[in-house]
Design a protein with these regions (language model features):
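Residues that define the transmembrane beta-barrel architecture of outer-membrane proteins
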Residues: 28-32, 49-55, 88-94, 110, ...
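Extracytoplasmic loops and strand-loop junctions of Gram-negative outer membrane beta-barrel proteins
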Residues: 38-42, 79-81, 133-138, 169-172
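Gram-negative (and chloroplast) outer-membrane scaffold detector with strong preference
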Residues: 58-133, 162, 191-194
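Solvent-exposed loop/turn segments connecting transmembrane beta-strands
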Residues: 42-52, 65, 82-86, 174-182
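Cleavable N-terminal export/targeting peptides
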Residues: 1-29, 194
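Extended low-complexity acidic/polar segments
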Residues: 93, 102, 132-167
Length: 194
């Protein structure tokens, strides 16, 4: 009986080792962020021709005070209704920004950050094809984009290495021939590297 209790104790120590909550968001810690979200509205079956979606990947590096530098890439696809069909607009952007730690709890499990980012990339409308299915010609052009984004992000630690993200952001981009502003919201995971 004693051997089994000792074995159970050793297993419990192994399972709960590495649970020091104070070792989070230290300077030079890095994490890979993977995000997915909706753009320019909420998805509904009746509005499926107007919806858009985003995917992103980035590297976050922490500084003093729990602030972060973020460097990454994002893909946004937005649809515009046209007769019985829809015309896709795609944006491929790179991002560099700073996220200021606004709020955190005492156990370092929950964080709220506000960020500002610079964006640059490329936009294509209808895959670069000017002629539509009914013979009409698109006047929109493909082109390079530049601008910025403001982000509000909530993070909660699921484990010491896995973080759940919830975010909302507004992008403002010039240079394209379609909409300038894009509101986004979504979820993501951050995998802490060290």
């Amino acid at each position: 009986m004693r051997k089994s209790l000792f074995f159970l104790f050793v297993v419990m120590l192994a399972l709960f080792a590495g649970q020091a909550h104070a070792q989070r968001c230290l300077p030079k810690m890095k994490g890979i962020r993977l995000t997915a979200g909706m753009a320019d509205g909420f998805y509904a079956k009746s509005a499926s021709n107007n919806t858009g979606y985003t995917f992103g990947a980035s590297l976050a590096t922490y500084t003093k005070g729990g602030h972060q530098w973020v460097l990454g890439a994002e893909y946004l696809r937005r649809y515009h209704p046209y007769r019985e069909s829809r015309i896709p607009t795609e944006q491929f952007t790179g991002e560099g920004g700073f996220f200021l730690g606004v709020l955190s709890d005492g156990s370092k499990t929950f964080f709220l950050s506000a960020g500002v980012s610079a964006l640059a990339g490329y936009e294509t409308v209808n895959g670069g094809r000017k002629l539509l299915f009914d013979g009409s010609t698109l006047c929109n052009k493909d082109g390079f984009l530049y601008g910025g984004a403001v982000t509000l992000q909530a993070e909660t630690y699921l484990t010491d290495r896995l973080v759940l993200l919830l975010y909302g952001r507004e992008r403002c981009l010039w240079g394209g021939s379609t909409e300038r502003f894009h509101a986004q919201y979504g979820v993501g995971l951050k995998i802490m590297l060290d």
